């Protein structure tokens, strides 16, 4: 019947006649607009016919494609587009099925023009907001086909560019159509993301090629519009901007895999650009998820080449800085923990020369300079990320890093690697470098918060080590914490300026919190400065750091008491150079003389006591004329000019404690304290830091003032503590520790080797002994209550306690309530 109707036009259904009428006899004439208006009006009037109209148009289009009548194909697609734009009703879902079938047919074609035509129609469809979603519609084919078009390798460059841009636009259309509708196909599934994201990144990689082919500035705007790289970037930004919390991981993982597969971490330019796009596109509250993904990827690549790991770390650095402006969530300490773990692994790799801990035939050979570059990248990342954190988080990070520094003790045996280096030493250096990066620029008004006791104790313990590099790092870290007004660079060179006003120092009055800090920790700081000055392995950088530390303490934390103590400390350093009990080299002795001259010149001008300034100036002038080797201008230069004999230093070349005490005492300073020579307090830190000499060959005079009489203060004779008494006390304590360790070893050995019956018998005997002791104690302490009538005499004339129950006792009326 339908076949007969097809022969006679008047008997054909109206929708078919309307569809046939929109096609002209010559396809070059284009769509017949008047007939198209009739078809549109009919579709709007009878929406139930839309599915039949779509099916018939699809039938004609498939036939025209097969017969290579591409003009009619274009007309059919134009008609479909107009119907889609005009019709918004519940029946459009059935029409869309026919439409998508025709688009898929065009995309399957090998003709680039048909592929582009189908993509453009799909993009128009994607921009239409449907009233009712379709539960059964699938876009899997379109994701696969558009992704394939993004990787087009057509011989013609212009056609290849058009196909790639069509593929990107198609992916953009799929994202727009599905991403906001939970009832549609879930575009965030890994099977889709693994195709979409790499396709966009592939086109982003070729941005340099596209820009290099731009022939002239006049054509630049047109070329920019045709640039697949920029279109891919916009699509990627749109995709990531729509990502919810649970979809971030699926979107980021393909990026990491793509960078791995194409070895794009090593140049790190493209990887950094990708993650900048990601960090600026996603919602700020989701930034920490990206950081977590990068940290996990870094751990997964812990055995990759150092250049790959360095690229990941630098990308992590850029991403972390951006994330810190938004929200980094709970990943702050996690990030630092991962970086420090990678730092320790890198040290192990550099020492062993292999990722497996031992060199074998199948193991990769590690290049030490690449591991050093990776370590520097990690330290730089730690510093750059820490600089974005608020003060309270930065303090936590500082304490966290310091807790990871291995302190030298009997519990940390020396470990050697291929080069004979100490693994602990390298770890200490790297962690102290990281700590220095974090502390640089750290601003904290309260020094008690910036340098808490547990942190300061651990830090200063490392300051007593024999390793010169570690000592220098500790000094630099202390300087970074104390310098709160940016004065550090003004003391980078040691000199005896006649007028320090040219330095333009920023000086504030010492706050109450700073005073409390110095009362608690000043002697500890002075002691470490004093001992650091006596190290014979010091070089010019050490003395510059010591000078900077002394100067910054004087500016940031000094009151009158601190000034007096610092002067005593520097005069004690001068005595070290003069007496030379440590047998220091000539350079070190001259450097100590020069250090003392530079600091006393500075502090005299800060105190503005004329007589003090005059004395310091006179000594400096005398040295300039007769002993320039005792001034920083001759010592701290590339080629120091030193004296061959320092044993005959005359008193005119020295700063005299009696003279300084006299002139400062007249200005209100504590002259009695100034007269006392500085003597460092000895602690157990020397033993913990493995120093060669634990005790110093000095005598400590300890004066104890009696506080019993408020009317009169009496002084008891000073107890003389000599080197021998100190040595005996330390040796005795060491012997006690050895005995305790031996006892513990015997107990452990007994429980490991003795039979169970013997151990059980021993424990049972101890339990019975304990019970008997308890019974004796109870007999002594628990007695019957005393008798109110006193004692009575028993037989043999012995007094006997007679106990009366409490409820039978007779109490006076006044005692009864």
From Swiss-Prot:
Name this protein carries in UniProt: Protein EFR3 homolog B
Superkingdom as given in the UniProt entry: Eukaryota
Record membrane topology: Lipid-anchor
Post-translational modification: Palmitoylated at its N-terminus, anchoring the protein to the plasma membrane.
Biological function: Component of a complex required to localize phosphatidylinositol 4-kinase (PI4K) to the plasma membrane. The complex acts as a regulator of phosphatidylinositol 4-phosphate (PtdIns(4)P) synthesis. In the complex, EFR3B probably acts as the membrane-anchoring component. Also involved in responsiveness to G-protein-coupled receptors; it is however unclear whether this role is direct or indirect.
Assigned keywords, A-Z: Cell membrane, Cytoplasm, Lipoprotein, Membrane, Palmitate, Phosphoprotein
Cell location: Cell membrane; Cytoplasm, Cytosol
InterPro entries registered for this protein in UniProt: ARM-like, ARM-type_fold, EFR3-like_ARM, EFR3_Homologs
């Amino acid at each position: 019947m339908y076949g007969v109707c097809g022969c006679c036009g008047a008997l054909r259904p109206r929708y078919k006649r309307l569809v046939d009428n929109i096609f002209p006899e010559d396809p070059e004439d284009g769509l017949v607009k008047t007939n198209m208006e009739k078809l549109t009006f009919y579709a709007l009037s009878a929406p139930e016919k839309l599915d039949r109209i779509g099916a018939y148009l699809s039938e004609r289009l498939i036939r025209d494609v097969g017969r290579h009548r591409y003009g009619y194909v274009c007309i059919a697609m134009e008609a479909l587009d107009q119907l889609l734009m005009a019709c918004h009703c519940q029946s459009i879902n059935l029409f869309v099925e026919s439409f998508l079938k025709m688009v898929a047919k065009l995309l399957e074609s090998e003709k680039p023009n048909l592929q582009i035509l189908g993509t453009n129609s799909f993009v128009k469809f994607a921009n239409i907001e449907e009233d009712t979603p379709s539960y059964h519609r699938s876009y899997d084919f379109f994701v696969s086909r558009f992704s394939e078009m993004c990787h087009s390798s057509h011989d013609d460059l212009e056609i290849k560019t058009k196909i790639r841009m069509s593929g990107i636009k198609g992916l953009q259309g799929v994202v727009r159509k599905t991403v906001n509708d939970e009832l549609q196909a879930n575009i965030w599934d890994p099977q889709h993301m693994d195709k979409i994201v790499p396709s966009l990144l592939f086109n982003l990689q070729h941005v340099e090629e596209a820009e290099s082919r731009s022939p002239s500035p006049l054509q630049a705007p047109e070329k920019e519009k045709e640039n697949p790289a920029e279109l891919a970037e916009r699509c990627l930004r749109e995709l990531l901007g729509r990502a919810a919390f649970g979809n971030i991981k699926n979107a980021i993982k393909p990026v990491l895999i793509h960078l791995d597969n194409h070895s794009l971490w090593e140049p790190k330019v493209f990887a950094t650009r990708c993650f900048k796009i990601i960090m600026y596109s996603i919602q700020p509250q989701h930034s920490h998820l990206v950081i977590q993904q990068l940290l996990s990827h870094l751990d997964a690549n812990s055995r990759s080449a150092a250049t790959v790991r360095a690229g990941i770390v630098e990308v992590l650095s850029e991403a972390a800085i951006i994330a810190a402006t938004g929200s980094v969530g709970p990943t702050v300490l996690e990030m630092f923990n991962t970086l420090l773990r990678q730092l320790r692994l890198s040290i192990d790799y550099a020492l062993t020369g292999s990722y497996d801990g031992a060199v074998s035939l199948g193991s990769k050979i590690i290049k030490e300079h690449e591991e050093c570059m990776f370590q520097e990248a990690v330290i730089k990342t730690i510093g750059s990320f820490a600089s974005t954190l608020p003060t309270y988080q930065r303090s936590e990070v500082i304490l966290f890093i310091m807790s990871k520094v291995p302190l030298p003790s009997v519990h940390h045996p020396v470990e050697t690697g291929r080069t004979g280096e100490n693994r602990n030493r390298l770890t200490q250096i790297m962690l102290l470098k990281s700590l220095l990066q974090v502390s640089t620029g750290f601003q904290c008004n309260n020094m008690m918060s910036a340098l808490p006791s547990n942190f300061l104790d651990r830090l200063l313990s490392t300051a007593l080590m024999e390793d010169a590099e570690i000592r220098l790092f500790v000094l630099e870290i202390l300087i970074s914490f104390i310098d709160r007004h940016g004065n550090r660079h003004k003391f980078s060179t040691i000199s005896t300026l006649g007028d320090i006003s040219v330095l333009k120092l920023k000086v504030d009055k010492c706050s109450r919190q700073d005073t409390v800090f110095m009362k608690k920790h000043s002697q500890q700081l002075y002691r470490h400065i004093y001992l650091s000055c006596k190290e014979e392995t010091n070089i010019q950088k050490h003395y510059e750091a010591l000078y900077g530390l002394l100067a910054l303490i004087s500016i940031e934390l000094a009151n009158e008491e601190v000034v007096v103590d610092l002067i005593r400390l520097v005069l004690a350093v001068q005595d070290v150079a003069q007496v030379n009990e440590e047998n220091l080299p000539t350079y070190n002795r001259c450097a100590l003389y020069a250090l003392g001259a530079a600091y006393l010149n500075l502090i005299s001008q800060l105190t503005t006591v004329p007589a003090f300034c005059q004395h310091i100036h006179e000594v400096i002038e005398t040295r300039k004329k007769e002993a320039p080797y005792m001034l920083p201008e001759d010592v701290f230069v590339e080629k120091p000019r030193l004296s061959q004999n320092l044993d005959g230093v005359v008193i005119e070349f020295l700063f005299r404690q009696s003279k300084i005490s006299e002139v400062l005492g007249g200005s209100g300073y504590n002259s009695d304290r100034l007269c006392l020579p500085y003597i460092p307090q000895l602690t157990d830190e020397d033993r913990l830091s493995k120093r060669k000499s634990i005790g110093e060959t000095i005598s400590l005079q300890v004066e104890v003032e009696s506080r019993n009489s408020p009317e009169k203060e009496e002084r008891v004779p000073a107890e003389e503590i000599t080197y021998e008494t100190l040595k005996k006390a330390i040796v005795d304590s060491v012997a006690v520790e050895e005995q305790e360790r031996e006892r513990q070893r015997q107990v452990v050995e007994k429980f490991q080797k003795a039979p169970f019956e013997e151990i059980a018998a021993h424990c049972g005997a101890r339990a019975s002994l304990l019970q008997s002791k308890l019974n004796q104690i109870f007999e002594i302490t628990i007695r019957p209550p005393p008798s109110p009538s006193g004692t009575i005499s028993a037989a043999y004339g012995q007094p006997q306690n007679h106990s009366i129950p409490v409820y039978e006792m007779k109490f006076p009326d006044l005692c009864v309530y």
